[in-house]
């Protein structure tokens, strides 16, 4: 059962998982990016040593994929969004590798020592071939599985767009060791910049982004990136007591599915360039404050039919 009751063996197990992943360094992944840049979608190294990169699963050495999945689990355990008793019973120290797909992009920001400071993924639905979004045989995206819906029943897709032109934003998370406000904002912007570069590099072009967000938390990141967001109201998560991530939906404020259609194929590159300029500003907070107003981001709401 997904309870996270304190003081039991699963609590101690979760602490061990967090400790294990806290000591990992991905410094050699930076070396790999410098030695073999063609397999990386994005690489940016700032003057202070902060590094952000994007790499698809198919080019990520297995040991680093395990490490990334471990980072994801460790942060969610600390936030109380992963079920420690499920992790304990299944004896897992990272999120299951099987939930990733070959074309998923992993965007990572690291400290000069190689410690992960922030992470977000750009996920496919895992279909080997492109399908119509209303094809009953197509694989569901994770947000659709969690909420028990076809998200495009609630927000109409762009004409002609198929599964290979849709990506899901997942696991936008900062390291729990990151407490400085300026550094946290910096990492957020670096991840959004890397995400924009990954979207811009995708083939075929990404036309729609989906996922789910807390309205007063991650939604702000989407608006900061200049996205126009349509939220789906009135869904109910379908996760069971045996699901590792049930608490991601029960221990947070309402988590709502969203759809964001990109206006054209060049939009992501344009927004990435704007974020890169923001990151070069001497006053990061002021520059970030000016982003949403300048980009006319907005939120629309779609009520799920009963």
List each model region and its residues.
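Short amphipathic alpha-helix that is part of the acyltransferase structural core
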Residues: 2-7, 23-32, 38-93, 106-116, ...
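A contiguous, low-structure linker/loop signature
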Residues: 117-141
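A short helix-loop-beta-strand connector motif used in the catalytic cores of GNAT acetyltransferases and
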Residues: 96-108, 128-131
């Amino acid at each position: 059962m997904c309870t996270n009751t304190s003081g039991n063996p699963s609590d101690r197990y979760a602490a061990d998982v967090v400790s294990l992943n806290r000591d990992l360094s991905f410094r050699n992944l930076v070396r790999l990016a410098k030695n073999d840049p063609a397999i990386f979608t994005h690489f940016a190294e700032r003057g202070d040593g902060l590094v952000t990169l994007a790499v698809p699963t198919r080019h990520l050495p297995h040991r680093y994929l395990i490490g990334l999945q471990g980072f994801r689990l460790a942060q969610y355990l600390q936030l109380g969004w992963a079920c420690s008793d499920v992790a304990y019973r299944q004896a897992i120290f990272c999120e299951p590798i099987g939930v990733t797909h070959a074309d998923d992009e992993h965007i990572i920001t690291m400290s000069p020592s190689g410690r992960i400071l922030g992470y977000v993924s750009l996920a496919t639905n895992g279909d080997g071939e492109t399908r119509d979004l209303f094809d009953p045989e197509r694989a569901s995206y994770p947000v659709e599985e969690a909420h028990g819906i076809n998200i495009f029943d609630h927000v109409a897709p762009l004409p002609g767009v198929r599964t290979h032109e849709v990506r899901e934003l997942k696991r936008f998370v900062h390291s729990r060791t990151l407490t400085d406000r300026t550094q946290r904002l910096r990492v957020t912007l670096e991840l959004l910049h890397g995400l924009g570069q990954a979207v811009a590099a995708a083939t075929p072009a990404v036309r729609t982004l989906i996922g789910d967000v807390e309205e007063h938390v991650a939604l702000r990141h989407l608006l900061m990136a200049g996205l126009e967001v349509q939220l789906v109201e009135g869904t109910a998560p379908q996760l069971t007591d045996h699901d590792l991530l049930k608490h991601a939906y029960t221990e947070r404020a309402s988590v709502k599915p969203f759809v964001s259609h990109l206006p054209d194929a060049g939009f992501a590159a344009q927004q990435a360039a704007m974020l890169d300029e923001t990151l070069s500003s001497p006053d990061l907070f002021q520059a970030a404050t000016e982003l949403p107003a300048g980009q006319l981001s907005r939120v629309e709401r779609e009520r799920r039919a009963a």
